Regions:
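Extended, charge-enriched "interface" segments that sit outside catalytic cores
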Residues: 1-121
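Glycine-rich flavin
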Residues: 96-179
Length: 179
């Protein structure tokens, strides 16, 4: 293609020193994974979670953009087991890439782990399920700790003395990256 035909096609011009313009690739994924999923929107509304649309839309925009990119990095740079420190002492530490912690912070901040327990009203489980669905599209590996955190709340509530100490941390929307 000539420079004129590239302009006519609306394609970007090659950078100085580049050999050609790349125009046959899909654009970067930037989408709202909630509002763009009509079946999900209808299901959330139909099963009583319509009151959470604004929150779901906000999280859908994150999962379809910045969290998607973080998810690629979290999967590219997998956790590393460090068995010993530089002096030879056994430490058995797992080191995570910063993208993992960023995804966890966003998931916890959105309430993926505790939305239904913090919003005890009709449709809360539906809204929480939609958050899980959105989160998994960006990065599924973090769903294990988020789901285990969600699942422990009823067990803690069964023992009020234990719940007093542990439940505030479990339901918190502040991520603590410490091991």
């Amino acid at each position: 293609m000539t420079d004129q035909s590239l302009k006519a096609a609306g394609s970007p011009q090659p950078l100085p020193g580049a050999t050609h313009a790349v125009f046959n690739q899909t654009p970067p994924l930037e989408a709202n994974l909630f509002t763009g999923d009509h079946a999900l929107v209808e299901a959330v509304d139909g099963f009583g979670g319509g009151w959470a649309f604004e929150h779901l839309s906000d999280y859908g925009a994150k999962t379809g953009g910045p969290l998607m990119a973080l998810g690629f990095d979290a999967n590219r740079y997998t956790p590393e087991l460090v068995t010993h420190d530089r002096y030879g002492n056994r430490i058995d530490e797992v080191r995570f890439h910063p993208s993992y912690h960023a995804i966890m912070a966003e998931g916890i901040g959105a309430g993926v782990h505790a939305f239904a327990w913090n919003e005890r009203r009709p449709g809360a489980m539906v809204a929480r399920s939609a958050l899980v669905y959105l989160h998994c599209q960006a990065e599924a590996g973090t769903m294990c700790p988020l789901t285990m955190t969600f699942a422990v709340a009823p067990a803690l509530e069964a023992e009020p003395a234990v719940a007093r100490n542990w439940l505030p941390g479990v339901l918190s929307r502040d991520y603590d990256p410490r091991p």
